[in-house]
């Protein structure tokens, strides 16, 4: 909602700032293999350049990945995840298109609620959908959630709880979101149904908790 000047405002550190402190940074680089026995990390950059780094101590902070909804139509244009810096940049750029008026946000957790509020502030028609019976379900008690729901509704956000998204429809671009109760016009859809730990890297050598 223009509370920050751009997507860079979402981050507390920059590449330049970290380099100024002596860190070696490889952006847009995928770690493909970790040799735990010999303490080496192998990676490939976006341009195909190969990297090999040795370590004394290794910190795995691979974060999380968006939960992938297995529904038809998720590949349509303007169906967005918002997880990475690049995702935020893409959404902000697309919102410059005046034809994007109706936005459906799927998922009423922290990210879904914040995005719904931000879209409403810039004049978009917002539908917030969640399978639960309230926003922020599992985070707060009913009293606080009721206040939050009232605040969202009072600010013009349409709340659609207890609904399961079945399909996203469109011809190349998204046009409609279909749930088990009704359908919603959509020029953009934000999928914000949560995250799972990104444990793929090195999991064959590490003991993981079941949760």
Each predicted region: which residue ranges?
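Short, structured coil segments at secondary-structure junctions
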Residues: 21, 74-75, 122, 155, ...
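Short glycine/proline- and charge-enriched loop/turn segments
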Residues: 1-3, 73-75, 130
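Short hydrophobic/aromatic-enriched beta-strand-loop microsegments
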Residues: 79-82, 126-130, 209-211
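FAD-binding core/adjacent interface of flavoenzyme oxidoreductases
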Residues: 11-102, 176-185, 190-192, 197
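Short glycine-/acidic-enriched loop or helix-start segments at secondary-structure transitions
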Residues: 36, 69-71, 115-116, 138, ...
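Internal nucleotide-binding/catalytic subdomain
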Residues: 149-211
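Rossmann-like dinucleotide-binding cores of NAD(P)H-dependent redox enzymes
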Residues: 4-5, 10-11, 102-103, 110-167
